[in-house]
């Protein structure tokens, strides 16, 4: 177990594609060589989708992750409460199972029984309850870590796209683009690239908010009044930040290849080009937290649920990315811990 990590896996909405992409991922034999998975789910849900997919996976039934066995698919069984899978349908009961899985896995993570957590897609509506009043996983884990800020970071190979704002309506984006907020996101981003990706002196590109990055104030003044002065101040703090760049040309001309990270101003500005470039294989990483949480870069996929056609590449990559980030953090921690300190006489 020493060379592997223990990864908690939440089932997500059982009427979506979450169970399918989890099961399909284990057809990749590398996973059990490097990762010890612990799935939180009623067994009946997995059996339903296994039959649909004609898979014959076996599970180790355990009470808690401390009993997890290496090179096995470990399962912590949750009560199903007479739940029946209705693939493609949004139901209250499916939301309850998604929350139970998330809550139990998060609890075990907080007890250091898990090394990382990989979350399957949820429906942000039917999961809502007294204990889950969030716009998504990102906000949930941020509050559970007793933090006010985190960074939604999309990752695929060397492409990394962070978001200055997360799940905001368009009309709320501009008022949220403040220098104080940008500094918080940029500092998180810079630390993440160093600690979680082992990049020294990372270079970060900022996208403009308006078309053509504002055209010197002709199409909005956020760049001229906020973003450009912010970049100048960030450089004074020895942060390697550049821009603002017009988003369309930046991605179309592959300028992202010149940087270690890109900071988009709002959700779709970053995720649309990211998903096109990553070809459905990207990973969502919640950066800036003490824990490691990743997920696939897509939603519940109700329209294809239960049909056996869901692409599991993004979920599989989320498992491997969580493992890699965990080991990179450990490497940095060990280097810092074992740093040679010279006294004044030396």
What are these regions (language model features)?
Residues 154-184:
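Ligand-binding beta-strand-loop-alpha-helix segment within the catalytic cores
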Residues 1-137, 180-265, 269-275, 280-283, ...:
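Contiguous, glycine/small-aliphatic-enriched amphipathic segments in soluble metabolic enzymes
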Residues 144-159, 289-303:
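Short, flexible loop segments at boundaries between secondary-structure elements
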């Amino acid at each position: 177990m020493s060379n592997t990590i223990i990864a908690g896996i939440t089932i997500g909405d059982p009427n979506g594609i979450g169970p399918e992409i989890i099961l399909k991922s284990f057809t990749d034999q590398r996973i059990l060589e490097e990762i010890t998975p612990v799935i939180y789910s009623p067994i009946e849900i997995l059996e339903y989708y296994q039959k649909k997919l004609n898979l014959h996976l076996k599970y180790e039934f355990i009470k808690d992750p401390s009993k997890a066995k290496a090179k096995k698919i470990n399962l912590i069984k949750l009560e199903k409460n007479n739940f029946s899978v209705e693939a493609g349908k949004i139901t209250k009961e499916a939301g309850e199972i998604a929350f139970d899985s998330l809550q139990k896995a998060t609890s075990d993570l907080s007890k250091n029984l898990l090394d990382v957590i990989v979350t399957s897609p949820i429906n942000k509506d039917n999961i809502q309850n007294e204990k889950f009043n969030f716009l998504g996983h990102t906000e949930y884990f941020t509050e559970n870590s007793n933090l006010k800020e985190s960074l939604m970071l999309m990752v695929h190979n060397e492409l990394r796209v962070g978001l200055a704002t997360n799940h905001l309506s368009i009309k709320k984006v501009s008022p949220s683009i403040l220098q104080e907020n940008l500094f918080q996101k940029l500092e998180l981003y810079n630390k993440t690239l160093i600690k979680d990706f082992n990049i020294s002196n990372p270079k970060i590109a900022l996208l403009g908010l308006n078309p053509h990055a504002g055209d010197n104030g002709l199409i909005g003044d956020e760049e001229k009044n906020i973003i450009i002065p912010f970049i100048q101040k960030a450089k004074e703090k020895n942060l390697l930040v550049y821009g603002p760049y017009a988003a369309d040309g930046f991605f179309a001309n592959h300028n992202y290849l010149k940087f270690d990270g890109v900071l988009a101003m709002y959700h779709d500005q970053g995720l649309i080009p990211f998903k096109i470039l990553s070809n459905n294989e990207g990973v969502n990483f919640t950066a800036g937290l003490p824990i490691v949480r990743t997920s696939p870069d897509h939603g519940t996929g109700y329209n294809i649920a239960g049909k056996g056609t869901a692409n599991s590449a993004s979920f599989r990559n989320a498992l491997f990315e969580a493992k890699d980030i965990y080991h990179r953090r450990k490497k940095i921690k060990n280097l810092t811990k074992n740093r040679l300190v010279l006294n004044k006489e030396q």
